[in-house]
Each structure stands twice: as structure tokens, then as C-alpha cells.
Amino acid sequence: MSERAPVVTIDGPSGAGKGTISQLLAKHLGWQLLDSGAIYRVLALAAIHHDVELENEESITLLAAHLDVKFLTGNEKDPVQVILEGEDVTTAIRTQECSNAASKVAAFPRVREALLRRQRAFRTAPGLIADGRDMGTVVFPTASAKLYLTASAEERAQRRYNQLQDKGFDVNIERLLAEIIERDDRDMNRPVAPLVPAEDALVIDTSDKGIDEVLELALNYINQKLSHNN
């Protein structure tokens, strides 16, 4: 890990726009991108593939320690290609089932510890955009700049519905909303690394903001923090 490489963390709940903004920032700055949520989704999918119970912390932790996952440069539709045990799972990890399973395995303290070093290894020159739920509070507490994106549960459910519809999934928006509210509660109230803004993070409510507006706010803040740190 390069301690000198700057890190910008982007945390927040599911559907707040973290993934989109993170990809745009990484492309704009020419930095590395860490989608930490994808790591937990891959772990959840691996558990499902290997018939490991999602409630079994010991087995999930063992699986996490030996997780065979690679992140490759993708295409415009999927900027990051995710490979699990030699298989392309980029689309498979984006299902709602996988998302819910990821939230369950992410609640285990030993699982989070097992994946901590792997996440920190993404910090390489010229810099890193780290997208997740505890990037600014736990994984990179001394990050150069920290952002926290949020939005109403209703807006996030609508975004998720549109996203899944575009990918050809048949989904129910009422069920999506209920699952988002349930996941928010689970993520925000877990005893280890709960979903909360870092004290020094810039909080942006994206409910009524377009992508360009959020990106401009983020870039202005990042440039300000980087120039101050230098």
C-alpha cells in the first residue's frame, strides 16, 4: 500500500449514487477505483455457490480469507469487470438477492476484518476513489477527502427499480422500498462499522440533484481538500 497516494472516500446507503459518482471521479482524476460493496456481494455470491449458510460467521470468514476474486477494467456499461473463481459475475452480483445477502455477511466483525487488508491494498498511485459504507470511518480514516451521499428511501427505491428494469430484471418497487428500509436499519444499527457519515465528511443529499450537479460539488470539494493538504 502506498501511504502517500491520496484517497477520497465516498460512503452512503444503497441507491444514493455512490457507484455512479465514484466511477466518474475515478475517470476524471485518472485514479484507481475500489467498489467495496462489490467485494461483499462477491463474498455473498461465493457463499451461495458453495452452499455456505449466510448466518455462519465462521464459515463465511474462512471463505473471505480465501476469496478468489479479481477486478478488471471493463467497458462503458460495466467499467469494472468482476471475476469470481474464473467466472464473470459482474451482472450476477447486482441482483437484489445478492445485495441483501451481502448486507448480512457484512454485519460479521470477523468477516469485515478479513477483508480490511484486501481493501486497503487498493491504495496505489496516483490515487484511489473508495466507494462503500465505512470507507471514511474504518477503512481509510485518514483519507484526503471524505464524501457521504444520501437520498430518501423512496428516491433510492425508484432509482434501483429503473436500474434493474434496464438490466432486464422483473422487480416490484414496493418490495424494493421495503428491502431498502430494512437494509438501512441493518447497516446503520450493526455493532461493527455502522453506516454513519464520518465526522469530517461532506454530506450531499442527492434526492433532487442530477449527476452533473453532484459531480461538480464533489470535484470542487476534493480539489479544495487536496490543495489544502498539499
From Swiss-Prot:
Q: Does the keyword Kinase apply?
A: yes
Q: Does the keyword Kinase apply?
A: yes
Q: Which reaction does it catalyse?
A: CMP + ATP = CDP + ADP; dCMP + ATP = dCDP + ADP
Give the record's GO CC terms.
cytosol
Report the top EC class in one word.
Answer: transferase
Task: Name the Enzyme Commission number(s) assigned to this protein.
Answer: 2.7.4.25
Main localization of the protein described in the UniProt heading:
cytoplasm
One Pfam family name from the record?
Cytidylate_kin
Q: Could you cite one Gene Ontology molecular function of this protein?
A: ATP binding
User: Cellular location of this protein?
Assistant: Cytoplasm
Q: Which Gene3D superfamilies match?
A: P-loop containing nucleotide triphosphate hydrolases
- Top-level lineage group: Bacteria
Q: Name the PANTHER family on file.
A: CYTIDYLATE KINASE, CYTIDYLATE KINASE/PANTOATE-BETA-ALANINE LIGASE
Name recorded for this polypeptide = Cytidylate kinase
Name the source organism: Shewanella sp. (strain ANA-3)
The primary gene name is cmk
